[in-house]
């Protein structure tokens, strides 16, 4: 999505001159380092779940889906840097067919990262809701078969949507669709939270008898959601300003922070695995076994 994720350089020169805010430029080495760390961390999460049979349950499969989304966001930046490096060294023809195709694939990965995160957080929220309020029926409602079907549908939809958004990236309806998914996810989870709160008040005694792990999972989701909003909201706002007021000096002033907003997205992929590890004793044990080379049961 070139005009959506291409930075502030596309802004009108007159608007830049009318703005007193200089571009904030960060070294590419910072992006590359954070991206590498994000890929490695999320890869470790995936390997831990794959190698440990005790973690192969719906909840951790949904977490793996979020880890894949984070990893795609980091891979996007790594591949973009590699592409720029090859172009600057003269190995690629500027604006050539290969570069255009590679740009589209990389942009699709970026969109997949956002869409995958949105839907992964949504299904994690639904899973936490069922765990808390339908604990006795949980294993009959959230089966492995339904989990795999749900995740397959989500990623097929995200892939198709990502390709469509890249193809029609220069149309305003595409931008609106791209940005509207973010608040829609927030509304969905907020409604779920309100419903959970109302049910918790009316079933306080029942909720107090639930295993602590169930409530701990809800708190983990809240932390993940808060980090996601903090890291992605500035970029979503950038996209909206880029579309609807690209020449306004105040908008241009905010858009001069594009690289900081981009770094926040990269940081999201680094922070999430720490949240999993800190909140999940099972995952911590899996990490310890991986690094100490113990065999899994």
From Swiss-Prot:
GO terms for cellular component: plasma membrane. Disulfide bonds join 21-253, 245-251. One of its GO terms (molecular function) is corticotropin receptor activity. Ubiquitinated by MGRN1 that may be involved in post-endocytic trafficking and/or degradation of internalized receptor. Glycans are attached at residues 12, 17. GO terms for biological process: adenylate cyclase-activating G protein-coupled receptor signaling pathway. The chain crosses the membrane at residues 24-49, 59-79, 105-126, 148-168, 181-199, 218-244, 257-278. Homodimer. Interacts with corticotropin (ACTH). Interacts with MRAP; this interaction targets MC2R to the plasma membrane. Interacts with MRAP2; competing with MRAP for binding to MC2R and impairing the binding of corticotropin (ACTH). PANTHER family: G-PROTEIN COUPLED RECEPTOR. Belongs to the G-protein coupled receptor 1 family. This is Adrenocorticotropic hormone receptor. It comes from Mesocricetus auratus (Golden hamster). The gene is MC2R.
